[in-house]
Amino acid sequence: MSGFVGVIVSDPWLQSQLTQVELRSLNSKFVALKNQSGKVTLEDLPSVLVKVKSLSSSFKEKEIKEILGGLGSDYESDDDLDFESFLKVYLNLRDKAADKAGGGLKHSSSFLKAGTTTLHTINQSEKGSFVLHINRYLGDDPFLKQFLPLDPDSNDLYELVKDGVLLCKLINIAVPGTIDERAINTKRVLNPWERNENHTLCLNSAKAVGCSVVNIGTQDLAEGRPHLVLGLISQLIKIQLLADLSLKKMPQLVELVEDNEDIEEFLRLPPEKVLLKWMNFHLKKGGYKKTVGNFSSDLKDAQAYAYLLNVLAPEHCDPATLNAEDDLERANMVLEHAERMNCKRYLTAEEIVEGSSYLNLAFVAQIFHERNGLSTDGRFSFAEMMTEDLQTCRDERCYRLWINSLGIESYVNNVFEDVRNGWILLEVVDKVYPGSVNWKQASKPPIKMPFRKVENCNQVVKIGKEMRFSLVNVAGNDIVQGNKKLILGFLWQLMRTHMLQLLKSLRSRTRGKDMTDSEIISWANRKVRIMGRKSQIESFKDKSLSSGLFFLDLLWAVEPRVVNWNLVTKGESDDEKRLNATYIVSVARKLGCSVFLLPEDIVEVNQKMILILTASIMYWSLQQQSSSSESSSSSSDSSSTHSTTTTCTSTCTSTDASPAPSVTGEDEVSSLNGEVSSLTIEEDNEVSSLTIEEDNDADILSDITSISEEAANE
């Protein structure tokens, strides 16, 4: 059960100020420092803390050194600092960084920022709106209705999220069908493993719908940490509210395209910009002289709301609204008008006047859904006739979600548009191959000069060639011009390399050779075979994969408890294949795999996505062996710092997935040790005929060499 402990500190206040992801990161830095010189002093800290993301943008190493020099009354320069003192120093610097960035900012809502998942101050108004949203959309849920409605003024929300069911259900409300609800553990009382599985499923599924969860771990959700819970819920509600703001889902939006505007330019707009464009379209109709450019200050006087509602619902219009002299009075009249239109309140009049960005966005989105006022005549036939390459759309979605999951500073709304200046690609390349980018030669957005964009993209192509990507006749200008085929080709090679790099990082004891497709296939076949299952594949194009049975066998082989065979079909008809595929995606995420494919990719045997899914399962399985091996060899270090025994590489997901106990109740290291053990397989391949001998070296990949030989012979 050690996987649930996390990094524990004795001071409750310290524990509450940092997420488990932050604690693990800081703990690893502290342990590394201590291992270097035997102790950690103030003088050691500047060179380490300047590399921490939350501080690097605010301070240089020299500035940190000066700040730490001012702590002399609390610490001597040569004092041996313990971990908690180290954390206090970090928090001191973090507060100063926040003050330097602008003290007023840390109390304002940051939920509108795409990459935000951490908010250390709780906005009670926003929390109340989230609770009302949950009561409204999940009140009739067969499982949750026994716990709903929640009281907005209580802490019931934080208690209810602790078993993971509510968040999983909320993801399906935001993007229907994301989670196969058969994979959710919904007993009234869940054990710690079952709760952890739900949280792991939640976080991996949240990433798969576009949420940023880089600062959230399963332990944070299990504890119901308010700022993280609200940060995740706000992203899910925002995704739900903005889901229809695209031409693909609502062709009527083409009416917003102005005569001098390119349809392609409109397609590139993020949903928030489309919503503002829609609002200004109607305001112009109603004679409003200003242009609304944000969901905060431009709406504080409620005049824009009054004009908007008068255009959309003139039958409920009250002339006194525009004549009101007091902003608060006008805001109240606007809300009364909205209620007559059947728009439930997301905010109060005070919150309109205060300029709450998130609540205003939610309110405008609700008005849009209730009555968008757009034409339903032939004007939008062009949007309906637009032909889209379905596979291109799927690929763009997959790479967009993958990039956003990496934790880079930028956020991608549209791959083809957002990568054209080269900056995001440089950020991604640096994640895959740290240190490969020459940032001194890179230009950060906004970039006005076209040649600077070309320079960025040229560096991307140069690094790609150094990584041995297939980039024949590809130049940086091809990316700047938005060549979709070349962009998708580059991103596929980057995503594949990233996954193989993760696998390679676990092969250090076999001289770090590059992993090949054939080795991944051999590993998967062997894993299934040693468990006595009959399914095998020859390649990632094997048509038998469409039934889903091989992946279910593989998932069961790496962790038997995650697959409920009573829910599995024979995979013969199209409907049965889709049921299995949907279940596979959710089970893989529940296990701890960060995957972005769709069930259709399995049914149609999309070779690229099949490779990534198989490699993700392999990585998870081998990572558990690595964690077990490292925890046994470094238990003394772990006990001295109260660190979790489960380690995570810098590029792994932040879901803290812990290996569930196997069917036999034993740890996979001893009972299902396909990677660690030397296996003798009798001819009948039955489980009872397996002889497993312990490998004294506990090498997590001791059988990779034999797999490589098998692959070569094949």
From Swiss-Prot:
Keyword Transmembrane: no
Region span, Actin-binding 2: 393-622
Keywords, alphabetical: Actin-binding, Calcium, Cytoplasm, Cytoskeleton, Metal-binding, Repeat
Region annotation Actin-binding 1: where it falls in the sequence: 124-372
Compositional bias (Low complexity): 628-662
Biased composition annotated in UniProt, kind: Acidic residues: 681-694
Any one GO BP annotation for this protein: actin filament bundle assembly
GO cellular component assignments: cytoskeleton; plant-type vacuole
Primary location class: cytoplasm
Residue span, Calponin-homology (CH) domain: 124-241, 269-372, 393-499, 514-622
Region entry Disordered, spans: 628-694
Membrane spanning residue stretches: none
Subcellular localization(s) per the UniProt record: Cytoplasm, Cytoskeleton
Stored PROSITE patterns: ACTININ_2, CH
Polar residues bias spans: 670-680
A molecular function GO annotation: metal ion binding
Residue intervals of the EF-hand domain: 7-55
PANTHER family to which the protein is assigned, alphabetical: FIMBRIN-3, FIMBRIN/PLASTIN
Assembly and binders: Interacts with F-actin.
Function: Cross-links actin filaments (F-actin). Stabilizes and prevents F-actin depolymerization mediated by profilin. May regulate actin cytoarchitecture, cell cycle, cell division, cell elongation and cytoplasmic tractus.
Protein name per Swiss-Prot or TrEMBL: Fimbrin-3
